[in-house]
Amino acid sequence: MQSPVQKGIAATAVLAILLTIAGCASTGGVAPQASGIEPASLDAGNAIRAANADAQWPAVDWWRAYGDPQLNQWIEDAQAGNPNLAAAQARVREALSMAGVARSALSPQVNGSLSIQRQKWADNVYYGPGPLAGEQSWNNTATLGLSYHLDIWGKDRNAAERALDAAHASAADARAAQLELEGNVVRTYIEMSLNYALLDIAKATLQQQQQIVDLANRRLKGGIGTQLEVSQAETPLPEYERQIDEIEEKIALGRNQLAALAGKGPGAGDSIQRPTLSLNTPAGLPSALPADLIGHRPDVVAARWTVAAQARGIDVAKADFYPDINLLASIGGYAAMGPLFQFLKNPSHSWSAGPALSLPILDGGRLRSQLGAASAGYDEAVEGYNQSIVGALKDISDQVIRIRSLATQADDADRSVAAARKNYDLAREGYRRGLTDYLNVLIAQNQLLHAQEGVAKIQAERLGAHASLVTALGGGLDDPANGPQANETLPAHGKGKAATAGSNTGAVPANATAKVESAGRPDKAAPATAYTDRARNARPSAMKPSPAAASGANASAMSAVTATSVPAAAALPAKSGS
């Protein structure tokens, strides 16, 4: 004969089966619609195809190619002190903490309470006069409760993975912020170098003009010149002096900008010396472009992790369609009479244990709307990823075109300076001999000035184009060996990391490309643990890891600090709803 406990368990099991069959709401065919772009399928264009394809991916310290120790120091200072970068790193830590909160749902929850009170019982309350009316006694309780959610449908696990994926996306965003900061420092430094070159030209032009003024005065004294010629020669002097003042202002503002990028006050920039930039590195592209681009651009990596998080969100929304089962147990002691520790004695003890089941029956379409929102969020993330790929290739193509054009422009500008200098020397010599008037000298001088400024600007643009190409390639986010596999595009809905939980490989995807160190600066990292797929059509009950395995996997994930990794998957979700 069955005991009452056995009968209760059997009845609960039968009820659970019946409610599971009858109560599982239909998803109504709600499913994602977007498809991810395969980078290799995009036409890279003639500019990229014609570029040197034997180059390596940029080094993590790519700015050292400029050979300027002062620039190296300022970038290091900016990495250590920039408030915006520090805020991005704080967001990574926040996301990791939230991942820990989500992971905690995979573990049993144990709570205890203790209440020790001395109480005088009223004789006219809701319980009416009784044996305690008007008396004083100890009213003590102690309870210990345990709850454990049976994550049969993978809701808690997918929620934990979604939070961890969001943390990876946040780390990739932090790396993108660092790359932007590095690029801004380099561009500001290049602009300062240009202004120093323009200052040299302006000072040389002023000196040349002063020599012409002296020549005009000598001609006037010699009786072969006029006061008009002297006045014409003196007229440009204030403008040239104004240009010098303007350029010096720009240099000072550049110092302030560098100090601000490093999180310092303006005074820190006062010691900045003239840049000594030189760049002998030829422009080229990696041979694996565009296939490996998805593993080297931090914005693309962040977009892929966002897709992974949204895919987990779909799984969470689907799990809400199924019954929810919690195992509950409690034990306690209760005593309103007797000595202080009466509640700890056997007659005062009580306990309870059993499952608690809930399931959706009528929800007015709430669950389908939640699933629709999750699917739309996934589609939005996929299209954001697609746009990042398209934008990345455009950025690279733009810089390749610029570099090629600037190389040609540099040759043209050099010839222009040579011709303008020759013309200026002839005009000046002719004026000195009285063979031509001052107007020809002024025209020739302006032509030389513009030609020299053109050379300086093109040189600066070439330095800047190199920096822009490096940042377009990801700025040394990762080595090619740590990049994603050639057939990996997006993390697919229904392809998660749970399958590896039992092997204790952790929940951090493979191909880690950056990390946020404890000191707070994103930097290069070795690959993290494996990210493997589970079957698209796996039964929900097969998605549940053991509590110990799930706990170990997520602990391993959190111990990996902040890995900006590349989620691996070969396909997008199937379009059919389930």
Predicted regions and their residues:
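Terminal intrinsically disordered/low-complexity segments used for targeting and assembly
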Residues: 2-80, 140, 164, 248-295, ...
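Short sequence motifs at beta-strands and strand-loop junctions characteristic
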Residues: 134-138, 347-349, 450
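Short segments within alpha-helical structural elements
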Residues: 210-213, 239-268, 317, 415-473
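Periplasmic alpha-helical coiled-coil/stalk elements that build and connect Gram-negative outer-membrane
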Residues: 156, 172-289, 402, 447-448, ...
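Outer-membrane beta-barrel pore domains and translocons
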Residues: 113-119, 147, 195, 236, ...
